[in-house]
Amino acid sequence: MRKPYGLMLLFMVVSVAAAQPTKQTANVEQVWLGYFNQARFSDKWGVWLDVHLRTKEDFAKDMAVALGRVGLTYYLADNTKLTAGYAFINFFPSDNHRNISQPEHRPWQQLQWHTKYSKLRTMQWLRFEQRFRRKIKSDDELAEGHNFNYRLRYNFLLSVPLSKQAFAPRTFSGVVSSEVFVNFGKEVVYNTFDQNRFFAGFAYHLNAHDNLQFGYMNVFQQLAAGNRYRSTHAIRVFYFHNLDLRNAEK
């Protein structure tokens, strides 16, 4: 029981330390919406899909990001799996590209594992990304070629039931998570630490395979200039849909 609490405490300390105010920290308010689907169609194979929309500022003003991600999953065990896939991200017009969107192509690989205890559950993943972001010529025109860097992400999520029937359908649980992002590559100069995403909220378990998570998320990000930071205060709503199709085939 001590191990997951110790890991979560470590990431909470990282979150709080990273979020200390600086002279050049910009604060924005956003809404993050997401849908996740994991479908298992055999003992060893499955597929991954998630899609996201994020607003830009003042919670409902303009769009910032649209993202779609797909992957093929290989199950090492029921609670441990490897996934590799591709993501496409569209960054809507922003400060350095006011009249055009910036596309990004992002291959990714991931190790994910779940641990169940009598009164809590944890989920962790280690994700490796290769980011190809289209270069920008001006506010109105994309340039040829892409900026490239690698990014490593580690996510730790802790779920605690809020009823005697732990994680049963039509019950709630409390959810706390922290995800740390690290950049590396030739084009990364100042922001090796990319960002930390800290989330605290609730999950409503609709049934054995669906749950709705909602709550507050803070994203503390170091920008490429190195001396500028962004603190995003977000309302986050994610829907998780997990399907086991093996029984349907029998």
Model-inferred region functions:
Residues 47-49, 82-84, 120-126, 152, ...:
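Transmembrane beta-strands of outer-membrane beta-barrel proteins
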Residues 51-57, 86-92, 115-117, 128-132, ...:
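Transmembrane beta-strands of outer-membrane beta-barrel pores
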Residues 27-31, 64-66, 103-107, 146-154, ...:
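Residues that define the transmembrane beta-barrel architecture of outer-membrane proteins
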Residues 35-39, 70-74, 109-115, 128, ...:
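Residues on the lipid-exposed face of transmembrane beta-strands in outer-membrane beta-barrel proteins
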Residues 41-44, 79, 116-122, 162-172, ...:
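Short loop/turn motifs that connect adjacent beta-strands in outer-membrane beta-barrel proteins
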Residues 21-85, 89-92:
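Start-of-domain marker
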Residues 111, 231-250:
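Outer-membrane beta-barrel "beta-signal"
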Residues 126-211, 219-220:
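Outer-membrane beta-barrel transmembrane domain signature
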